[in-house]
Amino acid sequence: MKKTNITRNHLTFLAAAILCCLFAAGADAADGKLRIMVFGAHPDDCELKAGGVAAMWAKLGHKVKFVSTTNGDIGHAIMAGGQLAKRRTREVKAAAKILGIESHVMDNHDGELMPTLENRKALTRLIRDWKADIVMGHRPNDYHPDHRYTGVLMQDAAFMVTVSNFAPDTPQLNKNPVFLYLSDYFKKPNPFAPDLVVGIDDVVEQKAEALWTLQSQIESFWSARNFETVIPVPTDPAKRAAKKREFTQAFGRRTRGTADRFREKLIELYGEKKGRSIQHAEAFELCEYGRQPSPAELKKLFPFFGEN
């Protein structure tokens, strides 16, 4: 009898331990925190288009991962190949640390991304592994082929993430994420029409600080506006500080432009007073693939608007 009691005690302890493990394993899904994945074609696209909103989600404890679908290995006037790919990966990892998020760079050559079955499966696995509630990426009409095909691949994954026998090595998602597009200026076949415009005034300096880590782009395309010239970032402290101020002001003009461009939407979402006062913004358009949230659910997924 005594031996039986010990056995039962052991079984009770074991059952309790198993339950604890199960609850711990599901903690991320049950903690009420959102999981967001943003796809950009190059190691800077996510940071440029969604760095502000990512920092805001992160401050609220939500989990954000930026994914570059190419390694950026030709995005410089002089440097290229593996050396540049490694440099740009280091840069976006540093930017992610500033924003309070995670970063991943896929090993596809810059300028050579194709909407292949292999890449469709790769994006599907990434979304599933992250257990994403929200997925964002480029629209498929864009000036750069890598941007276009990133958009196509995201659209293709929008349904396949729920199909159990597609890429069956990762469990399908039982709830389809909400998919959204990052902003752009292209008009044909249809212009970007945001469903959400988020004021980022409180984090615009944090976003600029993250972008400042992308030195390979600052010294090349962002400064020279071509891929033939390098304008090195000064090493002299005073000149470097002046360059940083110039850089911060330039990107401030971009986010101010977004706020001004979509002022009426800001007023609709934030109310008249707040909507008119916002100086810096990022904008996102709902994709017609994936889960179609109500306006009320969208505001829960983007919990930045308050009551108006």
What are these regions (language model features)?
Residues 10-24:
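Bacterial N-terminal signal peptides
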Residues 28-130, 136, 152, 160:
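Active-site rim/loop-helix segments in enzyme catalytic domains that contact anionic ligands
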